[in-house]
Every structure is written in structure tokens, then in C-alpha cells.
Amino acid sequence: MKRRHFLAGAAGAAAMAALPATAQTSRGFDFIQVDVFTQNPLEGNPLACFPDAGGLSDAQMQAIARELNHSETTFVLPATAGGDAKVRIFSTTAELPFAGHPTLGTAYVMAKTRPGKNSLVLEEKVGPISVTLEHRPDGMFVEMTQNEPLFGAKADPKMLADALGFGVDEIDSRYAPQMVSTGSNFLIVPLKSVSTLAKLTLGHQLPPEQRAAFPGGIYYVVTGEPQIETRLLGATSEDPATGSAVGCAAAFLVQNSIRKPDERIAIRQGRFVNRPSILYVRAGMANGKATNVRVGGYVVDAMRGRFTI
């Protein structure tokens, strides 16, 4: 992780005293870092959340996200459309309309810093996202309702296998790989076994002529074994737990009768990058179509700090 500016307690006061007068006029912004989809710190997917980001410009938010170097960083602002708060989500390079683990992690931080509510509506660029918070004996469980699933184009299994580096016979032929969105686009690729999942490598991508039809990430889902496990690999990195993608997977599982409507499914992700995660999903069925996708998990504190600008 790149340089961070942490100032806290006596050490922070001493550091401030040593700064030039111009620097002492800068403002500190507190953040809370949490791990999402786990009950254990240093597992799951990390998120830095700024619970009071008023006064930060767009450029500063982007620069902070780049400095912290997480997959996403969130900034909480006053609500503008009737929700509980406006939430802006930044990757290291751009603002995102929606992301799963940042939504859950931000709701957790809000529950810690603004206690008293068991449900929240977060205003994100994709629209309002409803979140519930449940204080359980073993930790805080947070669950969001994602946008209604949209099912897109189906992909040719041989094309996928050739492009992504495994045999076509390793795709679960009972189900067609398909684009699904519950706020973000993902191509769901059903695999027969965890052994295929384990040998996937970074750097594979679809041919250029296929990328327009299948935008977004490729989410590998083991459908041929009782325990569902997943991976999301990019060109240079792997995501340890992907709330937006697992919502699409939930819709896919119910739509294809792999799991029953409203069955809560525990899905594993992240063990191949030493960040084991458990994502809990469920989806309903109405008029022959998957609906009411919910994604949840536990969230835990990791650390707190102050960013000075």
C-alpha cells in the first residue's frame, strides 16, 4: 500500500506542531477501514470509508482513493434524494456507479458512527440501495437489496474456453454462460469443479470482437459441486469478494433452478488470494424470472486513521 498520512493522538499533535504554518491550515478527514464478507480482520475485502466527506472535491476524492490503493474507497455525504446518505464510490482510477462490498461496508460504518437505525437507504449513482443491519451475537450482518436482474447475451462455451485458458469440457454444459446485471455487468461462467477454478490464471480476456457483447467482468461460478465457490480475475489482480458480481450469480442460480427461490446460499470467494470470504445471497422468483436479489455478509473493523489535506 502506498504512503498514507495518519495523524492520531499525541503523535498526531506533535507532527502537526512540526508542520509549516501553511500546512497547519489543512483539514483532517477521518476514515474507518473495514473488512467485508468476513468475521475476521485481515480477511474478506477491505474498504476505506470516510463517514464525513463534506468539503472534499471530486479530484481530492479520486486522489485519496488512488493513495489508499484499495479496490474501492467510499465517501459519505448528506442525502440529496430522500435517503439516509449519499455515497460516492471511487476505484483507484474512476468513480463507480455501484459496487457491492463498498455498499455493505459503508452501511456498517454508518451504523457505527450514526447508531440507531436497523435499515438505511444509500444514494448511489446507480440509484437508491436499501440496506438492513442485524446485530447478531457473532457480529454485525449487513444485507443489501440490489437492482432487479437483467439477463443479457449468452456466450459460446468454446469461444470462452479458448479465450480464458481451459477446456470446453470444464464448463458446466447444463447451463449457458450469460451476461447478468444487478447494477454492474458480469458474464457468469458456470464451471463443473473447484479444480478448474483453482487453475485459473490472470491475464486472460475475451477476443476484441466479443467485448462489446460481454462488457464488464467475468465471474467464474462452480455449479457442479454442492459448495458454490467463485473467482473474479482481471488482467493483473483478483478480487477477494465481489458483492456486485455475486448478486448476478444469485440471479443466475435461481433463474437456472440451481438453487431454490429465496434460499440463502453461502458462497465462497477469496481463498486463492489468502482473503477467504463468505458471501450470503438469495433471490426470489416471480413470473418465471429471478427477482429481489439480496447480498449480505459480516463486516468487521480493521483500523482507523486520519487523512490530512
What name fits each language-model region?
Residues 2-98, 104-309:
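Active-site proximal loop and beta-alpha junction motif in alpha/beta enzyme cores
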